[in-house]
């Protein structure tokens, strides 16, 4: 079956962000972005200023083709400092462009320090020092778009079988980002889990998906934790997740659903007001529940 915004539009909206509950997408037409050699610009600022600066730069500087943010993660200086990185096309574009490589001279060192952050607060401070001050000073940072997008997952692999990694992703309106930062400061440092990284990105308004993460433009915070692979570690993470979701939904935000079934059902319904119509459509198109998963059983059944 062919689906698009103009053909079988309802199913398209349900399948895009439908978590596999409305079928299997076997072929996809997507628009490609040309590969370019890019030059970075690094700007440090208080986290409270980040959202306004980030959105204003993206909205007004049309030369910016990629942008992201980071924040400090040590417990003593948690979310006390922010870094905005923007990329613009280099003036001279070589032909052909360089082959895809790792993302810079310090990538290997930063990967080692990334995993060393578990149980070692000094490594968190060292990583932030390299990423926010030393790296921008001693490396040119020029890279192709493809290289920036091709960071191997193996670089972040967890090798300690006593622990497991978990991602959280939250979406908040830029004008509420300061409140989100306060919520994270209140909750995350008290957790038993190790907080390893946060990457901030801009998400444009997208009202197409039935369960949209961005019915208005938002800032996404992708957060990486390392937790103990024990019942106590799992309970602690569940409590941390519920507390964060409570604060995020209180400011009109949402969270990405399928990382772990730690959210309460009422929290899912608050973050996604269209849940009832989503479930009704599921029962209409798939009454026998041919496509079913644990998330359906936990939140929608």
Language model: regions and residue ranges:
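Noncatalytic alpha-helical scaffold of FAD-dependent oxidoreductases
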Residues: 1-301
């Amino acid at each position: 079956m062919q689906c698009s915004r103009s053909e079988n539009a309802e199913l398209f909206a349900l399948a895009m962000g439908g978590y596999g509950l409305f079928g299997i997408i076997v072929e996809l037409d997507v628009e490609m972005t040309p590969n370019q050699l890019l030059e970075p610009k690094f700007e440090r600022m208080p986290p409270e200023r980040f959202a306004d600066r980030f959105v204003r730069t993206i909205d007004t500087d049309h030369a910016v083709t990629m942008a992201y943010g980071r924040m400090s993660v040590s417990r003593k200086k948690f979310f006390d400092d922010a870094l905005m990185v923007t990329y613009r096309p280099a003036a001279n574009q070589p032909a052909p462009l360089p082959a895809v490589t790792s993302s810079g001279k310090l990538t290997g060192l930063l990967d080692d320090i990334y995993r060393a952050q578990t149980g070692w607060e000094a490594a968190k401070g060292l990583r932030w020092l390299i990423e926010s001050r030393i790296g921008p000073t001693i490396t040119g940072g020029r890279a192709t778009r493809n290289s920036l997008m091709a960071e191997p997952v193996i670089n972040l692999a967890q090798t300690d079988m006593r622990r497991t990694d978990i991602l959280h992703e939250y979406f908040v309106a830029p004008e509420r980002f300061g409140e989100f930062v306060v919520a994270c400061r209140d909750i995350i440092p008290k957790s038993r889990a190790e907080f390893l990284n946060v990457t901030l990105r801009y998400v444009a308004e997208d009202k197409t998906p039935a369960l949209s993460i961005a019915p208005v433009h938002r800032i996404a915070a992708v957060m990486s934790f390392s937790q103990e692979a024990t019942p106590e570690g799992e309970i602690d993470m569940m409590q941390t997740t519920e507390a964060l979701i409570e604060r995020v939904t209180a400011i009109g935000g949402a969270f990405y659903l399928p990382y772990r079934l730690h959210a309460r059902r009422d929290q899912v319904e608050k973050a996604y007001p269209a849940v009832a119509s989503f479930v009704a459509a599921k029962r209409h198109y798939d009454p026998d529940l041919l496509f079913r998963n644990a998330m359906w059983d936990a939140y929608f059944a």
